[in-house]
Every structure is written in structure tokens, then in C-alpha cells.
């Protein structure tokens, strides 16, 4: 009788698992939206309710006593401290880096990832990063040639913990002792620093944007560039001092977009940081003031608000938008593959379960279509000419210029694109000593050094087509359809140590890199006109000081209140001195 009752309980507890899909598969049916359960004093038992009920009944029927030491080890495990949803979804997931040696290996790996619907995080000429569940690793290796079965290294083996670390929450006592988490000594001191100390959800970003437009109404306007599939507005900040009277020539406009892919949080934070830096320096810096007088700057923090919200509420690593497809359990369209120019989704990305699914026709991705319509309206009816386009993504630290759809088509302004691209990479190197490779988007898997050595050779085919070039990109559409003179896709930090889960202490350093990119971009566009005015562009560049770098684990931070007050005074004195020096140089 006991045995029969136990079997029945096991069957009941297993009903919810009948339709389960392995954690490494991209066709996992999305769970219902509910707030993330962050750490608290509640129980850390990660077992599902039915599992806990089953275990208790079996323990009482068979008289099994609880092993206190076992439960203590689970409670003390760093993995058990992750949010319950992250642990359930990604508890067994890892990120592997495969080292490629030839095109045959790349082709075999690409085919295997397509067959298993794996999530390719990044691809270069030397390696490919892939996320998958541990139980899927044998299946993947079985599809690969012998040379690749040992040619990989674990890149991330604590994915759930790293996901948890990206959320803005107070870490529990003892969690900072884990080697994967390094606290920062320098506390945030100003309003802007406090805002950029953590990643922010859309429910915080939108009111912040309204606040900026209200506080700085002379040169900031909050607009919407469209509406998402789920009905959310796609907010943007327009910076500039366009006069009330009609201008004789179209107003030159630069568009900066982030968050096309929902999980790339650093792109959204970087767009906001760059906008904030320009907003607060207007009227104080001759250089920034000149940029806002000569151009309109439109900053779109997240083109994919539905997907961004979903990464906060359900799945941190969601990439696409939330639009339904022909397969109800595989929603979403890749917004950077959905644009009309050279769209090739029917030929290369026709599977709705693919992370790169481009839809059934051009502009089926609603948010991409909305941005395109807004841009066309700006140029046709709002007396604007979009002269610059910066599309921020992550990760791999690359500055990419057109074309993305093919390496056989050479952009007519190639030399200018390369010249400015190299200048942008140089200013980043001067800012934080980080190296960004510069190449065409179709050769995104070929490093700048390779390109320099083979500049006179025919264009190369990307070694890993799954993560390489493609048609239907926003980059190509703005450059070709709108005749945007300078269009770039910038893949932000890092090179793989954290991937899409870049810790929040790198928000400000990455933001400084792109703020300096924007200054250099504007300086380049101003061109010869700037020679008539004494502008010191270098004085405005933001640099990351040594004390702003993440601290080592042995550092002892000062008490929070004392440190903040002291830092406030130091920052104000430094700002005043720098302004005085700048004014002295101008005179």
C-alpha cells in the first residue's frame, strides 16, 4: 500500500514536467510574468511546491528523517542564493568557448548549433561562445568533428549567480566573499552617479527621462519614436536648440539607439549615460553647447521595450521582441534582422525558434518598422537630415561600419567611414585603455589586425556565419535607404569574461567611452567650421581615473556616509579646478 501511494504521488508531482524542454533549448515555453523573487530572509529551498509536498509525504510514510547537514549545505551554497527564477531556468547552464582553427570547424559548429537551437553569444575569427545546458553538452560534442570535441574551455560555469549580480539589489552578508563578485570601493556621489550605479528597469528609466525633459526644457525634449507590439511607447530624448523660426536647410540629426536586443542591458545604460552627460554639460562646455546648437541628437535607450521588460520580469537572457510567431511557444523577432534593405530572413533565418529569427517578411518586427517610419517622417516632413547613426550592442568591443549583408559590396564612402571609425577606437583607447576593433559589419569576425594585413586582398567570408554578417540590419538600412553619411554599430564591453552579464560597476566606464565617442563623432561632423572658434575638444573628454576601477577584495572601504560626503567635496573641487583651467586656456 505504501508503495502504491508513493508511486501515485510521484506521478502527480511529475505532471508539470511532461511538456518540459531542456534548459539549453531556445523553445522553452515562456513562464507567466511575475516579479522576480530577490533575496530575503525567506527559505532558500529551490524545489518546486509539488516536489516539496511529495518529499514530505514520502518522508512521513517511510519514516525518513531529514538530513540537517544536507539542508545546511544547500542553504550555504552560493548557487542557492540566486533568484528562484534564474536558478530554475539557468541552474544547469554554462557558457563554453570553442576555439576555431579553420573554416571547416566553423561550419560544423554552426550546423550543430542550428540543429540543437543553441544560443550563440559571440563569434570571432578565433572563438565562438555558446550557452547551453550541461546535459546538452554530450549531444553537441557528438555532432562535432574530433578536432572540436576537446577544443573548448568553460567560460561561465555559474550563470545563475552572474544573472543575479546584474539586478540592482543589496547582496546578502557573505555573498561578496565569492570570487565572482568584487565590490567597488568608490561610492556614488551625485544624482547622476546614483542613477548609474545599477542597471535600471523601464519603470525607472521613463520617469527619469521625463525628469530630464522637465529640468532642462531649454535643450531637452522627450518624444516617442513608435509603439511596441504590446502597446508600450518607445521613448526617446531629443537634445538640441532648434530655433522657433524655420531653418533654410534641413536640421542635421544624429540618432543613437540601444536595446534592440533585450538582454544587452549595457547598451541601454550607455545611451542614457551619454545623453545625461550632454544634457548636464550644455551651457557649461563650449564644445557640448556647440554640438547641441549645430545638431539634434535623438537618444533611444531601448528600441525593444517589451523584450527589455521581459528580461527584468521573467528571462534575463531574452534577446528578441515579444511578438507572436507561427509557433506559439517560440515568440519573438530579432529586430536587427527585420529591416527591409537586403532582408534575407526567408533564406537564412526562417525558424521562429532561432535567436536570429527575422520574421516572415521585411519589417514584420514591429519596433523596427516603427523606428523606420519615424526616421522617414523626420526626413520627409520635419526638415531633418539624419547624418549620423550609432547602434549600440554588446558584446565583443567592435566598431562596425556598412555593409552587413555582404562583403562583396563596398560602401562608396569607405575611406571616410574607416577614418572616423579609427578615430572613435582611438578615443576609447585614450579613455579607458580598452581596445575596440574596427572593421566592416560583414567581417565582424575578422580582427582589425587581420584587416590591416589583408587590406588589398578580396573581402573575406565571415568564418562563422551564424554570428557574423546578415541582411536586414538597421546599420545598412540607415546608410543605404536614408543616405546617412556615418552609420556604425558599436559592440560594447566586454570580450567575453562576463558577456551579456557585465557587472554594474562597468556602467560608468563604458558610458565614458561612448560619451567620448559622441564628442569625437560631433567634432568630426563639425569639421572645418570648428576652426573659426576656439574649441578645446580634448578638455571635454571623460577619463576613467585609477580610483574608479573595481577594487580588489582586500580593500577596506570607508564608512558610507563619510565616504560620500568626502567624495562630494573632492568632486566639486576637482570640477571647479578643471573649469578654471579650461577658461584660462581659452583666454
UniProtKB/Swiss-Prot annotation:
Subcellular location: Vacuole; Secreted
Tree of life domain: Eukaryota
Disulfide bridge partners, by residue number: 330-353
Binding residues for substrate: 261-264, 319, 336-337, 394-395
Chain positions listed as propeptide in the UniProt record: 21-170
Pfam families: Peptidase_M14
Signal peptide: 1-20
Chain positions covered by the region annotation Disordered: 68-87, 542-573
Protein name as catalogued: Inactive metallocarboxypeptidase ecm14
Source organism of this protein record: Neosartorya fischeri (strain ATCC 1020 / DSM 3700 / CBS 544.65 / FGSC A1164 / JCM 1740 / NRRL 181 / WB 181)
Amino acid at each position: 500500500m505504501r508503495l502504491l501511494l508513493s508511486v501515485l504521488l510521484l506521478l502527480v508531482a511529475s505532471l508539470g514536467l511532461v511538456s518540459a524542454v531542456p534548459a539549453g533549448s531556445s523553445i522553452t515555453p515562456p513562464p507567466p510574468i511575475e516579479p522576480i523573487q530577490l533575496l530575503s530572509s525567506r527559505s532558500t529551498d529551490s524545489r518546486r511546491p509539488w516536489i516539496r509536498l511529495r518529499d514530505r509525504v514520502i518522508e512521513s510514510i517511510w519514516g525518513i528523517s531529514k538530513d540537517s547537514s544536507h539542508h545546511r549545505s544547500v542553504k550555504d551554497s552560493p548557487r542557492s542564493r540566486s533568484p528562484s527564477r534564474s536558478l530554475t531556468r539557468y541552474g544547469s547552464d554554462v557558457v563554453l568557448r570553442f576555439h576555431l582553427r579553420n573554416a571547416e570547424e566553423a561550419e560544423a559548429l554552426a550546423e550543430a548549433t542550428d540543429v540543437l537551437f543553441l544560443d550563440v553569444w559571440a563569434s570571432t575569427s578565433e572563438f565562438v561562445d555558446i550557452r547551453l545546458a550541461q546535459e546538452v553538452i554530450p549531444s553537441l560534442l557528438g555532432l562535432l568533428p574530433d578536432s572540436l570535441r576537446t577544443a573548448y574551455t568553460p567560460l561561465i560555469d555559474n550563470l545563475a549567480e552572474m544573472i543575479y549580480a546584474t539586478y540592482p539589489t543589496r547582496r546578502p552578508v557573505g555573498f561578496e566573499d565569492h570570487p565572482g563578485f568584487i565590490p567597488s570601493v568608490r561610492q556614488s556621489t551625485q544624482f547622476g552617479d546614483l542613477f548609474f550605479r545599477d542597471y535600471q528597469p523601464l519603470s525607472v528609466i521613463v520617469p527619469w527621462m521625463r525628469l530630464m525633459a522637465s529640468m532642462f526644457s531649454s535643450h531637452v525634449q522627450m518624444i516617442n519614436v513608435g509603439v511596441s507590439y504590446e502597446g508600450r511607447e518607445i521613448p526617446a530624448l531629443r537634445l538640441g536648440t532648434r530655433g522657433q523660426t524655420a531653418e533654410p536647410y534641413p536640421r542635421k540629426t544624429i540618432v543613437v539607439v540601444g536595446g534592440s536586443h533585450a538582454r544587452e542591458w549595457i547598451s541601454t545604460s550607455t545611451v542614457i549615460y551619454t545623453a545625461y552627460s550632454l544634457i548636464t554639460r550644455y551651457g557649461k562646455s563650449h564644445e557640448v553647447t556647440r554640438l547641441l546648437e549645430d545638431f539634434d541628437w535623438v537618444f533611444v535607450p531601448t528600441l525593444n521595450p517589451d523584450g527589455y521588460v521581459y528580461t527584468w520580469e521573467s528571462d534575463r537572457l531574452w534577446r528578441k521582441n515579444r511578438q507572436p510567431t507561427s509557433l506559439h511557444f517560440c515568440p519573438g523577432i530579432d529586430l536587427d534582422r527585420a529591416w527591409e534593405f537586403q532582408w534575407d530572413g526567408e533564406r537564412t533565418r526562417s525558424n521562429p525558434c532561432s535567436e536570429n529569427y527575422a520574421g516572415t517578411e521585411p519589417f514584420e518586427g514591429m519596433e523596427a518598422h516603427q523606428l523606420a517610419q519615424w526616421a522617414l517622417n523626420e526626413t520627409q516632413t520635419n526638415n531633418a537630415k539624419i547624418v549620423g547613426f550609432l547602434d549600440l550592442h554588446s558584446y565583443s568591443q567592435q566598431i562596425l561600419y556598412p555593409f552587413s549583408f555582404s562583403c562583396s559590396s563596398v560602401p562608396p564612402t569607405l575611406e571616410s567611414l574607416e577614418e572616423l571609425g579609427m578615430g572613435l577606437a582611438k578615443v576609447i583607447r585614450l579613455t579607458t585603455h580598452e581596445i575596440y576593433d574596427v572593421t566592416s559589419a560583414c567581417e565582424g569576425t575578422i580582427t582589425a589586425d587581420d584587416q590591416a594585413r589583408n587590406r588589398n586582398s578580396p573581402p573575406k567570408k565571415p568564418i562563422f556565419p551564424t554570428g557574423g554578417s546578415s541582411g536586414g540590419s538597421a546599420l545598412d538600412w540607415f546608410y543605404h535607404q536614408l543616405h546617412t553619411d556615418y552609420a556604425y554599430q558599436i559592440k560594447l564591453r566586454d570580450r567575453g569574461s562576463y558577456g551579456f552579464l557585465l557587472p554594474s560597476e562597468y556602467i560608468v566606464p563604458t558610458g565614458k567611452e561612448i560619451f567620448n565617442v559622441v564628442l569625437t563623432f560631433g567634432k568630426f561632423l563639425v569639421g572645418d567650421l570648428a576652426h573659426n572658434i576656439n574649441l578645446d575638444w580634448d578638455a571635454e573628454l571623460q577619463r576613467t581615473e585609477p580610483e574608479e576601477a573595481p577594487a580588489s577584495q582586500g580593500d577596506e572601504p570607508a564608512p558610507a556616509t563619510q565616504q560620500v560626503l568626502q567624495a562630494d567635496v573632492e568632486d566639486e573641487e576637482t570640477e571647479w579646478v578643471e573649469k578654471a583651467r579650461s577658461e584660462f586656456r581659452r583666454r
